[in-house]
Amino acid sequence: MAGHSKWANIKHRKGKADAKKGKIFSRIAKEIISAVKLGGADQKNNPRLRLALQKARDANMPNENIDRNIKKASSADQEDYHEMTYELYGHGGVGIVVDVMTDNKNRISSDMRIATNKRGGTVATPGAVTFNFDRKGILQISKKNAIEEELFLAATEAGAEDFEVDNDVFIITTDPSHLYSVKDAINHLGFACEEAELGMIPRTYVECSVETAKDNLALIEWLEELEDVDAVYHNMKIPEELENE
């Protein structure tokens, strides 16, 4: 199951943006509301809500915020959140996939047009970019919080597809339907998952010059700043000169 890290190429961009934006609570609130609307407020019977609540606790979201969002989801005045995926071509033929959760489709449509006008790139037809990505469950566990052999066996038995070691973390990928069962198996061992979420992993990567890569990263960061954007994925192989920026 081991191999080169398909996630490492993009995860540092996402993590950097999360820390910078201060959007974490807002995103988690939307996930809680959406999960309750789809599956009810009983987390025992709603794995999606259970994962959202774990994210809330990991992010130190106050309990009153969590309770307020659960109650908000049951209100008739609360608009439904729509999950959408935008596909873009960046600079140099790089494919970009944008996951959106919004209560205003017109707003995000306008925001996407402004982003491409300001930073370049074009909106692609549905399927033109995503065919080169696989949606997977992705879990990250710090090496200091787990024993590799025990983690590998538990994850494999629970349905994990891939197990990788990347610097100071173990990265486990699963079919989306097995994300919750693998996470529960890891938690049962007493190992803490630093991240457990659905994500898009490229099948192939595009190599770019440093300047083209900078243009793409500027576009990606602009997209990540948008209110309704949850995650941005790309298949650009980031030049070594930019990996730590």
From Swiss-Prot:
Cellular compartments annotated: Cytoplasm
Keywords on record: Cytoplasm, DNA-binding, Transcription, Transcription regulation
Domain of life the protein comes from: Bacteria
GO BP term (any one): regulation of DNA-templated transcription
Protein known as: Probable transcriptional regulatory protein pc1328
Family of the protein in this entry: Belongs to the TACO1 family.
Cellular component, GO, one term: cytosol
Species: Protochlamydia amoebophila (strain UWE25)
Any single Pfam family the record assigns to this protein: TACO1_YebC_N
UniProt-recorded Gene Ontology molecular function terms: DNA binding
PANTHER family: TRANSCRIPTIONAL REGULATORY PROTEIN YEBC-RELATED, TRANSLATIONAL ACTIVATOR OF CYTOCHROME C OXIDASE 1
HAMAP family assigned to the protein according to its UniProt record, in alphabetical order: Transcrip_reg_TACO1
InterPro entries associated with the record: Integrase-like_N, TACO1_YebC-like_2nd/3rd_dom, TACO1_YebC_N, Transcrip_reg_TACO1-like, Transcrip_reg_TACO1-like_dom3, YebC-like
